[in-house]
Amino acid sequence: MKNPAPYRYDIVGSFLRTKAIHEARSKFEAGEISAEELTKVEDAEITGLVKKEENVGLHAVTDGEYRRSFWHMDFLWGLTGTQKVKSEHFSVAFKGFQPKAETVKIVDKLDFPDDHPFLKHFAFLQSVASDLVQPKQCIPSPSMLHLICCVRSTDYQPIERYKDEQVLLDDLAAAYQKAVKAFYAAGCRYLQLDDTSWGEFCSAEKRKAYAERGIDVDEVGRKYVYVLNKILEAKPEDMVITMHICRGNFRSTWSSTGGYEPVAEILFGHCNVDGFFLEYDSDRAGGFEPLRYIGKQKVVLGLVTSKDAKLEKKEDVIARIREASKYVPLEQLALSPQCGFASTEEGNLVTDADQWSKLTLVREIAEEVWAD
């Protein structure tokens, strides 16, 4: 049977951390509880979250990223050949609050270790999800490691092995191929790659800043599609791999603005993922015209914001779905919130009740628009 993901109404992945999670993480960092005690709290809270996800009617469920500090760093720090580093500031500036100044650098040959902690995290999610839903695993796109270490960083010096950048790209692809196979072996059939690089490359301001440093972001984008397509060669037929594209989501703030046109042909026209989750909740994302480059991929429209509590009007969202269907057939479209509710452990400036109201709205709209 064909894997139906992404679903007509779906989620990006992260949820607001509960009070118990916040308290346990604080105690763990202060040395007041052990790693085992922290895991016990996380397990209990994730079990409760999955029940709530099922109760709201979701077909795909996640662990809310409850075990992570960041949507991306925890995974990247777990790769062989990377190192967690403290820095003076986060790797990208947000319009408002700034995240913790922790980043990553490449210090050795890249690889995906057999004991990467996320494999155990997925196994637990699968163990508490019912047979009626599909557990979904979200990890950062490979582009993020290259973007943070080699593009955003103004003082990047490649290690000896990576003086030829092609070797780096091929090692990165091989590491992620191993990740895909390992998650598949663990039972994962729905994997999402989260990626803010394309959001940056949509920004005229950021494109100009990179150009002034001698960086051709279109060329970088082509390299990322090369890596992504190499990874997708390892994807078994009954596994779905999607990509979520974001313009930043930290405590309800953002980091990039600009429509998809600058990256549309390179990304939508050539990247072989099964679907794109696309942020479309504000005018910062531009119009739907760039979707004309979409081929067979499904497009999950992020028309409902996760950044504030105000509920969108159903008729407005439905009108926008109809508008998007001028460029992509309605049967290839789906609906989700624009991003997660807590891309970092701090979370967006919304309440627990708000996030469930948003998901209920997404489900109700999808049921009105699509018969299936």
Give the positions of each predicted feature:
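Domain-level signal for soluble alpha/beta catalytic cores
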Residues: 1-372
